[in-house]
Structures are given as C-alpha cells and as structure tokens.
Amino acid sequence: FEDTAANVMAYINKWIAKKTKATRNAMILKVADEMTKGKEVVISTIDSLKDVFNVGLDPAITTGAMVIANQNGYHSLDKLKDKEGKYILQPNPTQPTQMMLFGKYPIAKVSNRTVKSEPVYSPAFTISGSKLAIDGTTTAIDASATSDVTAWKVVKGKYVVTCKGQEQETTVDAKVSAYKHPVYMGDLKEAITLFDRNVITIDMNDKAAGLWEKDMTGIKVRDRFDVQPVDDGAIIKGNITEVVQG
C-alpha cells in the first residue's frame, strides 16, 4: 500500500484541476449572461443563425467567432438541416472530433449541469366561483376576475400569485411548458478578459474542526482569478425554445 497515498493525491490534484477549470468557465458564462441580459435573440431557424453571424456580429469578430451551447442547445442545433438536407453541424476536416457550424464556426458543448436551460411557465388563470384557479386547480385565493392577478412567480415549484395587490402562496405545482436552451455566439476572447494569476494554493490539515478524531484530512483550495467584460458587441446570446410535450 506504499503508493496508495500518492494515488489518492494524484486523484485529488486531477479533481481540483477539473473543478477550477469548470469554475472559470462558469464565471465566464455568468459574465456573458450579464453582458447580454435583455438583448437575447430567438434562434428558431437556420436563417436566425445567419442573422447573428452575417449582421449581428461585426465582420472583425466573426473571424474568431465560435459557438457555445449546453447539451440541450447543441442537440437542437445538431438536428437542423439546410435546404439540401445536410446537417448544419459538420466535423472539422482537420479535427474530426470537433464540430463546426456552417463549416466555419467551432462549437463547444458544455454540460447541462454547468449551463442550465431556463424553464418557461405559462399558467392559465381562470375563476372558479369566487376563487382563483390555476391550470384548472382551484386555489384558496379570492378573485372575481383574472385581471385581479397582476404578477406571479414560481417558488420551490409552486406558484406565488399577487392578487388584488397581495402576494399569496398556492399549493399548485408549476408546470414547465417549455425550456429555453442558451447558445452563445461570438468571440469570447474579445468580449471577456480572464485575469488569471495561475496560482492555486492547496492546504491540508488533519487536526482542524474535529478531523483528527474522525481520521479525516481536510483540504482547502484557493484559486485567484477575475473575469471582466470588455466588448459587449463581441458576443450575442440566443435562446432555442423547446416546447414540452404532453
């Protein structure tokens, strides 16, 4: 068992490297979301993609442009075909494992856990007697007309409704009617700067917080970096809406 500790440390170092990379990517996309908030475009056809690359992005940007999508968004793009029946995502001739959009723009697929699709809710409000009903389920909320509802939101899977100026919780399950899959298009190197000190410190301790008594060792990792927006014209965020069936 002499190499057991070394094997464990090798595994931990590999795990830390993987997590720090994921953290950087998540922060970069968080900044991208902030830069594009309220300016998202709808991606529903091949033409809508061409609108982004032909008109939405400056020609100087498209030369270094790429596409980033989560698994759901990638899957939606991967099913699109042109008028000749060819898929718009094709392997890079020089790197067969890399896919290209329109044969020009590399596309990167990231995990749905890292970049989540946004759920869309479309509650139907009706009046049942003197009570408000949501999606056919009668609530305890007094209402005489659907116009009494001025706002709603979803909290922990349930609808919270503002009716007659009062915010009230309900027991009605919020049903997802669709998902918006995010697609980032442009040159991230021009849009965002990663200030990376390339310094990761790892501290190990087996005596803190009762670790000694439990025969455990604690690990603390410090990673110093920052992400800042540079050019909001270098990136466009699109949403692919997928309707939930049933």
Where are these regions (language model features)?
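Flexible, glycine/threonine- and acidic-rich loop/arm segments that mediate assembly and lattice contacts
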Residues: 1-40, 211-246
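Extended oligomerization regions of viral-like shell subunits
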Residues: 37-134, 140, 150-225, 245
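Short acidic/polar hinge/loop motifs at secondary-structure boundaries
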Residues: 145-146
